[in-house]
Design a protein with these regions (language model features):
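N-terminal beta-strand motif that seeds the catalytic metal site of vicinal oxygen chelate
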Residues: 1-21, 27, 70-77, 118-132
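Core segments of cupin and vicinal oxygen chelate
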Residues: 1-5, 11-55, 83, 89, ...
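Vicinal oxygen chelate
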Residues: 6-15, 43, 60-82, 103-108
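Short beta->alpha transition motifs characteristic of CBS
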Residues: 53, 98, 106, 117-124
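A short, acidic/glycine-rich surface segment
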Residues: 56-62, 125
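Short intrinsically disordered coil segments
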Residues: 65-68, 89-93, 132
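Short, contiguous alpha-helical
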Residues: 111
Length: 132
C-alpha cells in the first residue's frame, strides 16, 4: 500500500510543555528544535514529539475510564529494569496496573500520560514479536 504521507510525529497536551519535553528527551534523547511558552517540539531520530500547553489539561485516569488515555507511547528496550529505574528517577511514576510485567512496564509521565517500556520486537522479546 502506498502511504498518503510520512508520519512526522505526535503531539501531547499537558500543563507544562517544557518540563514534559525535557522528560521525554531524558527517555529517548533527541534535540529540542522549537520552544515557546505554549509549544515545545522535540525531534528524536527524525520523529517529532510536540508538547502543547492546555490550561484545562487533566491527566488520563487509565485503566479507569473516567478520563480516557487518548494516546500512549511505547519504548523498545532489552533492559526493562534499567529503563524503568531511569524513568522513575526522571519523574515518572509506576502504574499499579501491570498486565504483563515480564514484557511490558507501564508508567505515567510527569503529566500523567501512560507510556510503556517493552521487550516486544527485540531479541529477548516474546517469540511472536521477533523479526524473522
Amino acid at each position: 500500500m502506498d502511504p498518503v504521507a510520512d508520519l512526522a510525529g505526535v503531539t501531547l497536551d499537558c500543563a507544562r510543555p517544557q518540563d514534559l519535553a525535557e522528560f521525554y528527551q531524558r527517555m529517548a534523547g533527541g534535540e529540542i528544535m522549537y520552544s515557546s511558552d505554549r509549544v515545545v517540539y522535540l525531534v528524536v531520530g527524525g520523529f517529532g514529539m510536540a508538547f502543547q500547553q492546555d490550561p484545562a489539561y487533566q491527566a488520563p485516569s487509565w485503566p479507569e475510564p473516567h478520563i480516557p488515555q487518548q494516546a500512549h507511547i511505547d519504548f523498545r528496550t532489552t533492559e526493562l529494569d534499567r529503563s524503568e529505574a531511569a524513568a522513575l528517577a526522571a519523574g515518572a511514576r509506576q502504574s499499579p496496573h501491570q498486565p504483563n510485567p515480564d514484557v511490558w512496564r507501564v508508567l505515567f509521565d510527569p503529566a500523567g500520560h501512560p507510556f510503556c517500556f517493552s521487550t516486544y520486537g527485540t531479541a529477548i522479546g516474546p517469540d511472536a514479536s521477533r523479526a524473522e
